[in-house]
Amino acid sequence: MALSLSGLILPKLMQQRAFSVSSAVSAIQKLTRVRVVDNSTLGNAHHHRPPKVIHVYNKNGVGKVGDRVLLAIKGQKKKAIIVGHKMPGARMTPRFDSNNVVLIEDNGNPTGTRIKAPLPTHLRKLEGEYSKLLAIAQRFV
C-alpha cells in the first residue's frame, strides 16, 4: 500500500513514528541501573559502571519498594533492598527521582550505618522485616 503526495509515491514505512512511544518510566527489573543510598564502602566507591540489577527475588521479576534484588556492583554480587523507584505507585506513595537501593548482607542486616536518601513511610507498616533499615534511616517521606 502506498500513499500519493503530489505525484510522489511514498512507501508505508514513512508513516511510522521515528521515536519510541513506550512508557517513560518502569519498575525495577533485570539490567536496571540503580543508586546505592547507604554509606557502605562498596556503595560509596566511585563506579566506572553503575550498579545493575541481575535478579529480582519475587514471582514476576518486577521489583517494587521493599523487594530484595541481587546487584552486580564493582565486579561483585551483592543483595540489596529497593527503598525507592521512579515508577509512580499507588496514591499517596512517593515517586523518587532515581532507583534507590540499600545494600544488605545475606542474613538481612544492612551493610552501611546510615541511609542518605529518605525512605517511604509505608515501609514502617512492614517493620518486622525492615526494622534494622528503619533504625538507620534519617528521613522519611
Curated annotation (Swiss-Prot):
The gene is mrpl14. It is found in: Mitochondrion. HAMAP family: Ribosomal_uL14. SUPFAM superfamilies: Ribosomal protein L14. May form part of 2 intersubunit bridges in the assembled ribosome. Upon binding to MALSU1, intersubunit bridge formation is blocked, preventing ribosome formation and repressing translation. Residues 1-19 form a transit peptide. Component of the mitochondrial ribosome large subunit (39S) which comprises a 16S rRNA and about 50 distinct proteins. Interacts with MALSU1. CDD domains: Ribosomal_uL14. This is Large ribosomal subunit protein uL14m. Pfam families: Ribosomal_L14. Gene3D superfamilies: Ribosomal protein L14. PANTHER family: 39S RIBOSOMAL PROTEIN L14, MITOCHONDRIAL (PTHR21037), LARGE RIBOSOMAL SUBUNIT PROTEIN UL14M (PTHR21037:SF3). It comes from Danio rerio. GO terms for molecular function: structural constituent of ribosome. InterPro entries: Ribosomal_uL14, Ribosomal_uL14_sf. The keyword Oxidoreductase does not apply. Its main location: mitochondrion.
